[in-house]
Amino acid sequence: MKIRKAEEKDIPRLLALLEQVLQIHAEIRPDIFIPGTTKYTVCELAELLKQEDKPIYVAVNEDDVCMGYAFCQMKEQPFSTNMIPFKSLFIDDLCVDQQARGQHIGESLFEYVKQQAKEQGCYEVTL
């Protein structure tokens, strides 16, 4: 399993995984979630991929098919009178394909995100 930044070619798989997540939410909370929808559209995903401060990391199999993702966002704590400025990497969403669970893909994605945060000088990783 390889982990890399998401690319435009990953959008169909990202949408499929986002749909899996939304389906779970819709089953648990049908009063607020609409089945068959996703958090982002194709266009929104394409725009997200261009934003350096919102990296999307994907775990891909030997055929380069996305089996899981971590949507992240770089946040900077601005200077205030009681805190020094620092950067953190926020994990907005993490998903592993339901057919690939139990293979430590989520754990690998989380470890990769932590390493990326460290390399980018982040103070912390938050969920």
Q: Where are the regions that the model predicts?
A:
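A short beta-loop-alpha structural element at the N-terminal edge
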Residues: 2-16
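Hydrophobic adenine-recognition pocket in adenosine-nucleotide-binding enzymes
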Residues: 6, 94-96
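Conserved GNAT-fold acetyl-CoA-binding loop/helix
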Residues: 23-45
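A short helix-loop-beta-strand connector motif used in the catalytic cores of GNAT acetyltransferases and
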Residues: 43-58
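Conserved beta-strand in the GNAT
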Residues: 58, 65-74, 95
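Conserved acyl-donor/pantetheine-binding loop and adjacent beta-alpha core of acyl/acetyltransferases
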Residues: 71, 76-89
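Conserved acetyl-CoA-binding loop-helix of GNAT-fold acetyltransferases
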Residues: 96, 102-115
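Conserved GNAT acetyl-CoA-binding A-motif
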Residues: 117-127
